UniProtKB/Swiss-Prot annotation:
Protein task: Probable transcription factor.
Major localisation: nucleus
Cellular compartment(s): Nucleus
An individual GO BP term: positive regulation of transcription by RNA polymerase II
Gene field: FBP2
Domain MADS-box: 3-57
Annotated GO CC locations: nucleus
PANTHER family documented for this protein: SERUM RESPONSE FACTOR HOMOLOG (PTHR48019)
Protein name per Swiss-Prot or TrEMBL: Agamous-like MADS-box protein AGL9 homolog
Location of the K-box domain: 89-179
SMART domains listed in its UniProt record: MADS
InterPro entries, alphabetized: MADS-box/MEF2_TF, MEF2-like_N, TF_Kbox, TF_MADSbox, TF_MADSbox_sf
Organism whose genome encodes this protein: Petunia hybrida (Petunia)
Superkingdom, natural source: Eukaryota
Amino acid sequence: MGRGRVELKRIENKINRQVTFAKRRNGLLKKAYELSVLCDAEVALIIFSNRGKLYEFCSSSSMLKTLERYQKCNYGAPETNISTREALEISSQQEYLKLKARYEALQRSQRNLLGEDLGPLNSKELESLERQLDMSLKQIRSTRTQLMLDQLQDLQRKEHALNEANRTLKQRLMEGSTLNLQWQQNAQDVGYGRQATQTQGDGFFHPLECEPTLQIGYQNDPITVGGAGPSVNNYMAGWLP
């Protein structure tokens, strides 16, 4: 008995679905390559995974040239009478598809750089992604280092300016202290000069001591009051030669 027809439907198991996709994709790419080699045919194959991952094969040197050839054959046949408006619409649609594919590719690349959707990637693609991350890290470190150096130079310039301002203030304080000392010294010198002038003036003028009795030729000796008789004798003796 032969095998019955297998119903084609979506594989529910995620792991089995990814494994089946990888096997069928590789087989399809292999068949396209064999067809191009064996039959000398120009073959172009484009596959998008359910996560938006692009897989392609082109037997010619450029996928874009093959697509342009396809577009010319499909939309630009001589027997087809296409108006200018329709041609513009087709051109706009083609440009939109290109931009959409580019946008989706950038989104996939961004998710891969963030560590997402890495399951469909093979070893070469992972190595390429790793190199991109290494280059990004080097650029980030270089930018951060340059930023730190610029900040350090700015701080050094500010430090130099503050040191100059501090040196100027110290110099002004020293000049002010010197002037203050000179002023105090001058004030002391002026005070000493006034005292010396007063002392010299006092030497010219002596106070007169008023004696109650004018005694000519009498030496002013202390008188000891002992009695009436000695006092008179002493007084008279002062007048005798």
